[in-house]
Amino acid sequence: VDERGQWWNATERLIHEGILFFFKSNLYRAADGRFFIRSEFGDRTETGWLRAVRGFPIFADRALVEPERGVVRLVLDNGLILERRGEQLSVGDADLVWTDLLPSEQHPALGERSVPVRLRPGAMSSLAAFLEEDGEHWALNLGGEKQTLAEKIPDFTSDPGR
């Protein structure tokens, strides 16, 4: 996965939506930080390790803001829907908003570390009316409650020696 979140197989960019959906739906992260895809075909199981992940492998296509509940529901491009409070969202470089897909939110829960998920511009635009910046921090104002976003750079590194 390159810096722009595009998936590659050697020198060929993967563009088939069905294949990308399958990979993203079965993407996990090991304790050492390496990303892997787990495939099950009947009673056969196969694990494929990604050589390099340099950017966000999964994206939130839409954000549904529920101010009365104080949450944002994120619709991911792998079919999952995550519910987040502002504190569970992070702001990285260039005011990029992202969150962690936790192993417990994946089914089956095979991973041991979270997978970073970036909000696409369409999802970000849904947050615009609720986002505030005070010169130091970004916050979501949901139902009169100010929820400060974490300031954190996403980690794509792996440590096989761990």
Regions found by a protein language model. Give the residues of each.
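Long, non-globular segments of proteins
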Residues: 1-162
